[in-house]
């Protein structure tokens, strides 16, 4: 007796293909036809595995986060707050522009919701970005506690500054900015760091790019 329809596709590969569609077209712009064609499955299989288009997008975000975990771990492990900032912005600039054909330019967290009208999707993406900002804020709080950052520094504002700069890099990459352009912008943004926190210039410390 058959107990259920066997899954005849690789879930991870299907998610990677769906990720590219959402990345290029945004949540709202990605039709079910586009998604199922890219994933190599039919609509019943999509619904059976993910429940809905929104469920698929959530699964894609989880997979994207898995890719980013190594990158964020390396960023946060940098020995000083200045090097954390350096590793984060230069890493983002490299990731969103020099994809080697693996991904579209830009960032799924930004591009995925830019053209969407479904209010739940931008909120979902905002929560994911807030998690990254919280990681940076916590790291800077630790730096202030250890004396690496002055007591008068504002960890929340520093984390927010990096996130705003990173989001701008993502948008510019999607608009066609080159890797050189983005690294120059990152360098200018980082040149403000010493004045913001009262420390020396950040040393060069680049985290490994997320795959």
Tell where the protein language model's regions lie, with residue ranges.
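N-terminal intrinsically disordered/low-complexity leader segments
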Residues: 1-9, 199-211
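Helix-turn-helix
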Residues: 2, 13, 17, 21-55, ...
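Short, structured helix-loop boundary elements
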Residues: 11-12, 32, 54, 58, ...
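Amphipathic C-terminal alpha-helical segment
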Residues: 95-99, 142, 162-180, 192-202
């Amino acid at each position: 007796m058959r107990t259920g329809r066997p899954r005849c596709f690789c879930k991870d590969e299907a998610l990677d293909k769906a990720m590219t569609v959402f990345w290029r077209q945004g949540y709202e712009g990605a039709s079910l036809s586009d998604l199922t064609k890219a994933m190599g499955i039919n609509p019943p299989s999509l619904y059976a595995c993910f429940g809905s288009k929104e469920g698929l997008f959530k699964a894609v975000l989880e997979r994207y986060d898995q890719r980013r975990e190594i990158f964020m771990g390396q960023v946060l492990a940098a020995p000083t707050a200045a090097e954390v900032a350096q590793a984060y912005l230069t890493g983002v600039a490299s990731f969103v522009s020099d994809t080697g054909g693996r991904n579209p330019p830009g960032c799924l967290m930004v591009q995925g919701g830019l053209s969407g009208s479904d209010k739940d999707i931008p909120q979902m993406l905002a929560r994911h970005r807030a998690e990254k900002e919280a990681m940076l804020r916590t790291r800077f709080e630790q730096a202030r506690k250890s004396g690496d950052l002055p007591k008068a520094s504002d960890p929340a504002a520093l984390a927010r500054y990096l996130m705003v700069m990173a989001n701008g890099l993502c948008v510019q990459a999607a608009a066609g900015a080159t890797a050189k352009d983005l690294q120059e912008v990152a360098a200018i943004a980082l040149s403000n760091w010493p004045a913001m926190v009262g420390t020396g210039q950040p040393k060069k410390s680049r985290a490994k790019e997320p795959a």
